[in-house]
A protein has these predicted regions:
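Acceptor-binding helix/loop patch of EC 2.4 sugar-transfer enzymes
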Residues: 12-20, 78-123, 191, 267, ...
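Short N-terminal targeting/anchoring amphipathic segment
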Residues: 38-61, 75-79
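Membrane-proximal helix-turn-helix segments that form the acceptor-binding/catalytic region
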Residues: 41, 64-71, 75, 101-140
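A short, active-site helix/loop in glycosyltransferases that binds the activated sugar's phosphate group
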Residues: 87-88, 118-159, 203
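Conserved donor-binding/catalytic core segment of Leloir-type glycosyltransferases
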Residues: 160-196, 202
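Short alpha-helical segment that forms part of, or immediately flanks, the ligand-binding pocket
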Residues: 230, 252-257, 271-272
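Aromatic "clamp/platform" in nucleotide-sugar-dependent glycosyltransferases that forms part
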Residues: 244
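Short hydrophobic beta-strand element within catalytic cores of glycosyltransferases
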Residues: 261-265
Length: 273
Protein backbone atom coordinates (compact mmCIF):
# COMPACT_ATOMS: atom_id res chain seq x y z
CA UNK A 1 0.00 0.00 0.00
CA UNK A 2 1.06 3.60 -0.59
CA UNK A 3 0.49 5.99 2.31
CA UNK A 4 1.19 9.51 1.10
CA UNK A 5 0.11 13.12 0.80
CA UNK A 6 0.62 12.89 -2.97
CA UNK A 7 3.73 15.10 -2.74
CA UNK A 8 1.59 18.19 -2.19
CA UNK A 9 0.37 19.87 -5.41
CA UNK A 10 1.76 17.07 -7.60
CA UNK A 11 -1.10 14.90 -6.30
CA UNK A 12 0.48 11.53 -7.05
CA UNK A 13 -1.95 8.60 -6.65
CA UNK A 14 -1.97 6.78 -3.30
CA UNK A 15 -3.99 4.20 -1.39
CA UNK A 16 -4.25 6.14 1.87
CA UNK A 17 -4.18 9.93 1.87
CA UNK A 18 -2.34 11.63 4.73
CA UNK A 19 -2.44 15.23 3.53
CA UNK A 20 -2.20 17.81 6.28
CA UNK A 21 -4.60 20.69 6.81
CA UNK A 22 -3.08 24.10 7.61
CA UNK A 23 -2.10 25.20 11.09
CA UNK A 24 -1.54 23.51 14.45
CA UNK A 25 -4.97 21.90 14.34
CA UNK A 26 -4.03 20.31 11.03
CA UNK A 27 -0.94 18.84 12.65
CA UNK A 28 -2.92 17.46 15.58
CA UNK A 29 -5.50 15.89 13.26
CA UNK A 30 -2.80 14.33 11.09
CA UNK A 31 -0.96 12.93 14.11
CA UNK A 32 -4.20 11.40 15.41
CA UNK A 33 -4.92 9.88 11.99
CA UNK A 34 -1.46 8.35 11.74
CA UNK A 35 -1.66 6.82 15.22
CA UNK A 36 -5.02 5.35 14.24
CA UNK A 37 -3.40 3.89 11.10
CA UNK A 38 -0.36 2.38 12.83
CA UNK A 39 -2.07 -0.93 13.76
CA UNK A 40 -2.75 -1.44 10.02
CA UNK A 41 0.93 -0.82 9.21
CA UNK A 42 2.24 -3.98 10.84
CA UNK A 43 3.49 -7.31 9.56
CA UNK A 44 4.88 -6.11 6.24
CA UNK A 45 8.02 -7.57 4.71
CA UNK A 46 9.31 -4.12 3.74
CA UNK A 47 8.47 -0.57 4.75
CA UNK A 48 10.03 2.06 2.50
CA UNK A 49 10.31 5.67 3.63
CA UNK A 50 10.30 8.14 0.74
CA UNK A 51 12.23 10.68 2.85
CA UNK A 52 13.21 11.23 6.49
CA UNK A 53 10.20 13.57 6.67
CA UNK A 54 7.84 10.81 5.61
CA UNK A 55 4.81 12.57 7.11
CA UNK A 56 4.05 16.31 7.37
CA UNK A 57 5.02 16.44 11.04
CA UNK A 58 7.92 17.82 13.03
CA UNK A 59 10.95 15.56 13.20
CA UNK A 60 10.51 15.01 16.95
CA UNK A 61 7.08 13.46 16.23
CA UNK A 62 8.49 11.21 13.53
CA UNK A 63 11.13 9.56 15.76
CA UNK A 64 8.49 7.57 17.65
CA UNK A 65 6.55 6.68 14.49
CA UNK A 66 9.72 5.44 12.81
CA UNK A 67 10.58 3.29 15.83
CA UNK A 68 7.06 1.82 15.85
CA UNK A 69 7.17 0.93 12.15
CA UNK A 70 10.64 -0.57 12.48
CA UNK A 71 9.62 -2.65 15.50
CA UNK A 72 6.48 -4.13 13.92
CA UNK A 73 7.74 -4.90 10.39
CA UNK A 74 10.50 -7.04 8.91
CA UNK A 75 12.78 -4.69 6.98
CA UNK A 76 12.94 -0.91 6.58
CA UNK A 77 14.37 0.99 3.61
CA UNK A 78 15.20 4.69 3.44
CA UNK A 79 14.75 6.42 0.11
CA UNK A 80 17.33 8.90 -1.14
CA UNK A 81 15.11 10.66 -3.66
CA UNK A 82 15.48 14.34 -3.00
CA UNK A 83 16.16 16.95 -0.40
CA UNK A 84 17.60 15.59 2.84
CA UNK A 85 20.53 16.07 5.21
CA UNK A 86 23.00 13.97 3.22
CA UNK A 87 22.22 15.81 -0.01
CA UNK A 88 22.56 19.21 1.67
CA UNK A 89 25.66 18.35 3.72
CA UNK A 90 27.71 16.44 1.15
CA UNK A 91 27.04 18.90 -1.68
CA UNK A 92 27.89 21.82 0.61
CA UNK A 93 30.96 20.36 2.37
CA UNK A 94 32.60 17.59 0.31
CA UNK A 95 31.26 18.78 -3.06
CA UNK A 96 31.80 15.52 -5.01
CA UNK A 97 29.63 16.80 -7.89
CA UNK A 98 30.78 19.43 -10.37
CA UNK A 99 27.50 21.24 -9.76
CA UNK A 100 24.36 20.65 -7.72
CA UNK A 101 21.60 22.46 -5.87
CA UNK A 102 24.26 23.65 -3.41
CA UNK A 103 27.50 24.19 -5.33
CA UNK A 104 28.96 25.26 -8.63
CA UNK A 105 32.48 23.85 -8.73
CA UNK A 106 33.96 24.51 -5.29
CA UNK A 107 31.80 27.57 -4.71
CA UNK A 108 28.76 27.41 -2.45
CA UNK A 109 25.59 28.62 -4.09
CA UNK A 110 24.16 31.56 -2.17
CA UNK A 111 20.68 31.78 -3.66
CA UNK A 112 17.82 32.04 -1.19
CA UNK A 113 16.61 28.44 -1.57
CA UNK A 114 20.06 26.87 -1.11
CA UNK A 115 20.74 28.91 2.02
CA UNK A 116 17.33 28.00 3.46
CA UNK A 117 17.74 24.26 2.79
CA UNK A 118 21.21 24.15 4.39
CA UNK A 119 19.85 25.91 7.45
CA UNK A 120 16.87 23.56 7.53
CA UNK A 121 18.76 20.26 7.29
CA UNK A 122 22.29 20.60 8.67
CA UNK A 123 22.57 20.23 12.46
CA UNK A 124 18.81 20.33 13.04
CA UNK A 125 16.20 17.92 14.41
CA UNK A 126 15.26 16.77 10.93
CA UNK A 127 18.93 16.36 10.05
CA UNK A 128 19.48 14.20 13.13
CA UNK A 129 16.39 12.15 12.26
CA UNK A 130 17.90 11.57 8.81
CA UNK A 131 21.18 10.36 10.36
CA UNK A 132 19.31 7.99 12.67
CA UNK A 133 17.16 6.52 9.91
CA UNK A 134 20.10 6.08 7.55
CA UNK A 135 21.97 4.23 10.29
CA UNK A 136 19.09 2.04 11.48
CA UNK A 137 17.29 1.20 8.22
CA UNK A 138 18.24 -2.13 6.65
CA UNK A 139 18.82 -0.57 3.24
CA UNK A 140 19.08 2.75 1.43
CA UNK A 141 17.76 3.09 -2.12
CA UNK A 142 18.67 6.10 -4.26
CA UNK A 143 16.89 7.01 -7.47
CA UNK A 144 19.43 9.30 -9.12
CA UNK A 145 23.20 9.16 -9.47
CA UNK A 146 23.52 12.40 -7.50
CA UNK A 147 21.81 10.99 -4.43
CA UNK A 148 23.75 7.72 -4.64
CA UNK A 149 26.96 9.77 -4.65
CA UNK A 150 25.97 11.35 -1.33
CA UNK A 151 24.92 8.18 0.54
CA UNK A 152 27.32 5.54 -0.81
CA UNK A 153 30.50 6.85 0.89
CA UNK A 154 28.82 6.58 4.31
CA UNK A 155 26.92 3.31 3.73
CA UNK A 156 28.65 1.40 0.91
CA UNK A 157 27.25 -1.97 1.97
CA UNK A 158 23.59 -1.05 2.05
CA UNK A 159 23.22 1.79 -0.47
CA UNK A 160 21.72 0.65 -3.78
CA UNK A 161 20.97 2.63 -6.92
CA UNK A 162 17.61 1.72 -8.48
CA UNK A 163 16.54 3.96 -11.39
CA UNK A 164 13.08 5.48 -11.34
CA UNK A 165 10.50 3.13 -12.91
CA UNK A 166 8.35 4.23 -15.82
CA UNK A 167 5.34 2.27 -17.07
CA UNK A 168 5.94 1.71 -20.77
CA UNK A 169 2.83 1.99 -22.92
CA UNK A 170 2.46 1.51 -26.64
CA UNK A 171 5.18 2.96 -28.84
CA UNK A 172 4.52 6.66 -29.50
CA UNK A 173 3.56 7.78 -33.00
CA UNK A 174 6.28 10.28 -33.89
CA UNK A 175 5.89 12.19 -37.19
CA UNK A 176 8.91 11.86 -39.46
CA UNK A 177 8.59 15.26 -41.10
CA UNK A 178 10.17 18.35 -39.53
CA UNK A 179 7.48 20.62 -38.01
CA UNK A 180 7.17 24.21 -39.21
CA UNK A 181 7.31 25.32 -35.59
CA UNK A 182 9.07 23.60 -32.69
CA UNK A 183 6.67 22.97 -29.80
CA UNK A 184 8.72 23.53 -26.63
CA UNK A 185 7.34 22.86 -23.14
CA UNK A 186 8.71 23.97 -19.77
CA UNK A 187 7.24 23.31 -16.34
CA UNK A 188 8.13 25.64 -13.46
CA UNK A 189 8.10 24.37 -9.86
CA UNK A 190 6.51 26.80 -7.44
CA UNK A 191 9.14 28.95 -5.68
CA UNK A 192 12.01 26.73 -6.90
CA UNK A 193 12.87 27.97 -10.38
CA UNK A 194 16.17 29.63 -9.42
CA UNK A 195 17.10 26.69 -7.20
CA UNK A 196 16.59 24.19 -10.04
CA UNK A 197 17.93 26.47 -12.77
CA UNK A 198 14.70 26.53 -14.75
CA UNK A 199 14.74 30.33 -14.57
CA UNK A 200 17.88 30.35 -16.74
CA UNK A 201 16.42 27.82 -19.17
CA UNK A 202 13.19 29.81 -19.40
CA UNK A 203 15.07 33.01 -20.21
CA UNK A 204 16.98 31.19 -22.95
CA UNK A 205 13.75 29.81 -24.42
CA UNK A 206 12.08 33.23 -24.27
CA UNK A 207 15.03 34.78 -26.11
CA UNK A 208 14.76 32.16 -28.87
CA UNK A 209 11.02 32.82 -29.04
CA UNK A 210 11.67 36.56 -29.35
CA UNK A 211 14.37 36.13 -32.02
CA UNK A 212 12.51 33.48 -34.01
CA UNK A 213 8.77 33.92 -33.33
CA UNK A 214 7.83 32.02 -36.49
CA UNK A 215 9.94 29.00 -35.51
CA UNK A 216 8.91 28.30 -31.91
CA UNK A 217 5.78 27.69 -29.87
CA UNK A 218 6.62 28.01 -26.17
CA UNK A 219 4.27 26.65 -23.50
CA UNK A 220 5.04 27.51 -19.86
CA UNK A 221 3.11 25.93 -16.97
CA UNK A 222 3.46 26.30 -13.21
CA UNK A 223 2.53 23.99 -10.36
CA UNK A 224 0.46 21.40 -12.23
CA UNK A 225 -0.47 18.05 -10.65
CA UNK A 226 1.54 15.25 -12.25
CA UNK A 227 -1.31 13.73 -14.30
CA UNK A 228 -2.27 17.15 -15.67
CA UNK A 229 1.39 17.91 -16.35
CA UNK A 230 1.68 14.79 -18.50
CA UNK A 231 -1.53 15.57 -20.42
CA UNK A 232 -0.41 19.16 -21.04
CA UNK A 233 3.02 18.02 -22.21
CA UNK A 234 1.58 15.73 -24.89
CA UNK A 235 2.04 17.11 -28.39
CA UNK A 236 5.31 18.85 -27.50
CA UNK A 237 8.47 18.14 -29.48
CA UNK A 238 10.75 18.78 -26.50
CA UNK A 239 10.66 19.73 -22.83
CA UNK A 240 13.16 21.75 -20.84
CA UNK A 241 13.99 20.21 -17.46
CA UNK A 242 16.30 21.11 -14.58
CA UNK A 243 19.61 22.82 -15.33
CA UNK A 244 21.47 21.57 -12.24
CA UNK A 245 20.73 17.86 -12.65
CA UNK A 246 23.08 15.06 -13.71
CA UNK A 247 20.20 12.70 -14.39
CA UNK A 248 16.72 12.77 -15.96
CA UNK A 249 14.09 12.65 -13.22
CA UNK A 250 10.43 11.61 -13.34
CA UNK A 251 9.09 14.32 -15.64
CA UNK A 252 11.70 13.94 -18.43
CA UNK A 253 11.54 10.14 -18.19
CA UNK A 254 7.78 10.30 -18.64
CA UNK A 255 8.30 12.72 -21.54
CA UNK A 256 10.77 10.44 -23.32
CA UNK A 257 8.37 7.55 -22.80
CA UNK A 258 5.97 9.50 -25.04
CA UNK A 259 8.59 10.38 -27.64
CA UNK A 260 9.23 13.89 -26.34
CA UNK A 261 12.88 15.01 -26.34
CA UNK A 262 14.34 16.08 -22.97
CA UNK A 263 16.66 19.07 -22.72
CA UNK A 264 18.18 18.57 -19.28
CA UNK A 265 20.46 16.41 -17.16
CA UNK A 266 22.38 13.64 -18.91
CA UNK A 267 25.93 13.60 -17.58
CA UNK A 268 28.24 10.61 -18.30
CA UNK A 269 28.18 9.57 -14.63
CA UNK A 270 24.44 8.95 -14.80
CA UNK A 271 25.02 6.42 -17.59
CA UNK A 272 28.13 4.82 -16.12
CA UNK A 273 26.41 3.85 -12.87
Amino acid sequence: IVVSNGDFWKDYPRDIDVSRRPGKLGGMLLLAKIYALLPRMRGYDIVQFINPLFFELKAKRLYRIFKNLKRHNQKTVLGGYGMDAYWAYVCSKDMPLRYSDFNIGKELRQNEEAIAERKDWIGTDKGRLNLLMADQCDGIVTGLYEYWRCYEPFFPEKTTFIPFPIVIGKEPDIPQETPEKLNLFIGISKNRSAYKGTDIMLRAAEKVKKDFPDKLNLKVVTGLPFDEYVRTMMGSDAIMDQLYSYTPSMNPLEAMNHGVICIGGGEPESYEI
